[in-house]
Amino acid sequence: MSVFGKLFGAGGGKAGKGGPTPQEAIQRLRDTEEMLSKKQEFLEKKIEQELTAAKKHGTKNKRAALQALKRKKRYEKQLAQIDGTLSTIEFQREALENANTNTEVLKNMGYAAKAMKAAHDNMDIDKVDELMQDIADQQELAEEISTAISKPVGFGEEFDEDELMAELEELEQEELDKNLLEISGPETVPLPNVPSIALPSKPAKKKEEEDDDMKELENWAGSM
């Protein structure tokens, strides 16, 4: 028999040989506590009544006052006994509840241990290591495949990377020189704008006078 079977017994329900279960015993103790608590309340009321009666009779009826005080003392004694009994029962109930809790905890731990054992029955540490190695190999293979797929393929066309870079640098230099020439070219001086208003022409009469003078000059030169 396993250690848990020795602790809790094979039957599991009733404690050994038909005895009460912890739950039944705990419930009975609680019922007893409730009964004694009600008895306490009753005795406290009786003590209050006898004290009132003793004060009422006082010096008028000493015999009745003394009887009331005697009854009060008896009730107080019973109340003290019940207080002690309640303390004992409360201690016993708490101990039983703790024991029952520990029992349930151990049962559940045993149940979990059996479940774990059953889960590991078909496992072998060497097989686990082999499986983890297979997983690592497959992951590595997947990485290699992904890298191969993502690598650009020229489909038979191969180019010299250095030659392409040199050509690119040459094109960049040509473009740079062109931009510099455009920036440092001859500066053009803007011409003045042509006036939009037409200049006044010579008067027609003045032009005729000049023509007459020229003719007169020609005639004088011919007569000499």
UniProtKB/Swiss-Prot annotation:
Q: Which residues form a coiled coil?
A: 23-183
Query: Keywords assigned by UniProt?
Result: Acetylation, Cataract, Coiled coil, Cytoplasm, Disease variant, Endosome, Host-virus interaction, Membrane, Nucleus, Phosphoprotein, Protein transport, Transport, Ubl conjugation
Tell me the residues on which N-acetylserine occurs: 2
Q: Which InterPro entries match?
A: Snf7_fam (IPR005024)
Q: In which tissues is it expressed?
A: Widely expressed. Expressed at higher level in heart and skeletal muscle. Also expressed in brain, colon, thymus, spleen, kidney, liver, small intestine, placenta, lung and peripheral blood lymphocytes.
**Phosphoserine: which positions carry it?**
184, 223
The PTM entry states: ISGylated. Isgylation weakens its interaction with VPS4A.
Q: What the record says about its domains?
A: The acidic C-terminus and the basic N-termminus are thought to render the protein in a closed, soluble and inactive conformation through an autoinhibitory intramolecular interaction. The open and active conformation, which enables membrane binding and oligomerization, is achieved by interaction with other cellular binding partners, probably including other ESCRT components.
Q: Report the protein's function.
A: Probable core component of the endosomal sorting required for transport complex III (ESCRT-III) which is involved in multivesicular bodies (MVBs) formation and sorting of endosomal cargo proteins into MVBs. MVBs contain intraluminal vesicles (ILVs) that are generated by invagination and scission from the limiting membrane of the endosome and mostly are delivered to lysosomes enabling degradation of membrane proteins, such as stimulated growth factor receptors, lysosomal enzymes and lipids. The MVB pathway appears to require the sequential function of ESCRT-O, -I,-II and -III complexes.
Protein name, entry field: Charged multivesicular body protein 4b
Q: Which organism is it from?
A: Homo sapiens
